[in-house]
Amino acid sequence: MSIIVGIVSEFKKFDADLKNPNWSVSSISSNNELIVSLWGHKPLIFKHPTERKQVYRDRIDRWTGNGRNEFKKNLAFALKEKLKIRPIIAMLDKSSDFQNILDGKDGSQYPKKFNAKTNWIGELTICDGIQFEIVFQFKKFIA
């Protein structure tokens, strides 16, 4: 399966379409939720120290590629409208490549797999235009 087919099919699980499957990493779903592809590698995602949650913390200025501006706009909209956030976790085929991503390389150039986390619901807890943090809670079943 190609990377494009993989990401498109994972967004469909949330009833969301990508504006451009070649570079989009976020979308507002028909359920008015922000659907976003996020890296599943530490240090960006980690377990909450005391609660059963996952925390994703990143900087928009670290992102490269055409999807950055669309993501920034969608993130601001999610903050303003208090949208729930639903993740699609991207995992590199070679985790050793992740340092390149942290160093600012374009993540679209690396082979990866996508996984829609349909039992995670997130809330934007920090968003200042550069830094952002999303805290995800787990649900056993989401209707």
Annotate each language-model stretch with its function.
Residues 1-142:
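Short helix-coil boundary/hinge micro-motifs
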